[in-house]
Amino acid sequence: MTQFFIGIMAMLMCMACEKPLMTGNQEEEETEGNLMIKVFEIEKTPFGSLTRATEEASAVCKHLNYAVYSTSGERLKQVNQTTGTSEFGTASFQLDEGKYRVVVVGHSSNGNPTMTDPTCIKFTNAQTFTDTFLYSDEMTVGEDQVELNVSLNRIVSMCRFVLTDDIPEGVKKMRFYYTGGSGAFDATTSLGCVNSKQDVKIDITNGDQKQFDLYTFLHDEEGVIHLAVSALDASGNELYAREFDVPMEQNHITWLSGAFFSGVSTTTVTGVTVNTTWEGEQHLTF
């Protein structure tokens, strides 16, 4: 099959974002090609607002991951980028003529997701879970240069946990352990693909820290996560604990707020009306 230089030009426009990896089938980015992905700016709809804003990619996410797969799902090429590097926002690949699936992921986790299989792109608890955006589609490479303009969409749901009472002395860490969502997603559907046990621990550096954002990939457009929240001392001993059943929706925030340290031990949230616009919020109290 004849080789062609492929250059992708990809303007990443998100509604609502490490260096090239060269192990296995992952290769260093080609400097020229007939398929080139270039990121100029990102159009996003912030979780907290129904208005759109356009920003540079580096203002929205810390990492961009580009992958090219065969139509059978084999990963052929991958380039990982982080902000602050000269190549951030531009990726170029050399491919044979044929059909491919192109996947671009934008996020701010502490590392790159595992992208071996496009139907199960995985983040880990150690990497943390953040606002995440996706482009995924099939395309054809022919004799002529291909410039592919892509638009990324937010695929996560967020639970914003807000404390309305003071954090007692001795609490050094908040732990959020939740099930019902997924730490991995299927790039062909944008939905969660595994039953994860997501575990997030956040250090408490001062008593003014009252808001904690938790992300997950739902298995459907709507779902419920079971959230166990605990406050730990410096030795990891549990001082306070409560549990919640939290309704979630893709691309939406669920605000969960209340007096954590002075309330009852278990709360179940029911009868919640969800804003069904593209981007919306629901406010729950406990």
Model-predicted regions and their roles:
Residues 39-58, 162-170:
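Structural motif
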Residues 154-172, 181:
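Surface-exposed interaction/gating patches
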Residues 1-16:
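Sec-dependent bacterial lipoprotein signal peptides
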Residues 149-156, 216-220:
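Conserved "repeat-terminator" motif of extracellular CCP/Sushi domains
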Residues 58-116, 172-252, 280-286:
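Tryptophan-paired
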Residues 257-286:
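Hydrophobic, glycine-enriched assembly/anchoring segments
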Residues 13-47, 251, 275-285:
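Bacterial Sec-dependent N-terminal signal peptides
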Residues 20, 82-87, 109-147, 234-263:
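Structured interaction patches on ligand/partner-binding surfaces of diverse proteins
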